């Protein structure tokens, strides 16, 4: 099994770009703020901590997906970009989306918030595995 650590680094950067694009400004960010009540002003005191947590969690996700893609590639003999993306979709569906849906349902969070956050996770997993698949 081979892992391109340059690919991992670039996939991590892609994941951070997705996070910033999803939650920083625009219609999705505005809807998320409205549903959570978390405004840029409320976020300011914990912004650095949250960015560190985002980077650590995205790094863990990227490395985990790199190993999943590498193992799947080694097991199947298929190292295509599409195989990597399929690994990302399967990982998202079985680990991320299902878990977030459970938590948000029991916490009685709005379906729109679940959709926004689950959509972000899908975009994140797709971006990461697309880049990994290219390397």
Model-derived features: where do they sit?
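Juxtamembrane/disordered regions of integral membrane proteins
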Residues: 1-135
């Amino acid at each position: 099994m081979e892992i391109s650590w340059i690919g991992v680094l670039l996939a991590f950067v892609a994941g951070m770009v997705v996070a910033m694009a999803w939650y920083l400004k625009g219609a999705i960010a505005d809807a998320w703020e409205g549903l959570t009540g978390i405004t840029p002003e409320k976020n300011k005191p914990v912004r650095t901590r949250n960015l560190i947590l985002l980077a650590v969690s995205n790094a863990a996700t990227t490395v985990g997906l790199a190993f999943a893609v590498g193992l799947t590639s080694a097991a199947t003999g298929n190292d295509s970009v599409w195989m990597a993306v399929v690994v990302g979709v399967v990982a998202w569906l079985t680990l991320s989306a299902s878990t977030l849906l459970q938590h948000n349902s029991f916490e009685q969070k709005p379906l729109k918030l679940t959709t926004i956050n689950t959509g972000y996770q899908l975009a994140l997993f797709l971006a990461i595995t697309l880049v990994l698949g290219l390397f």
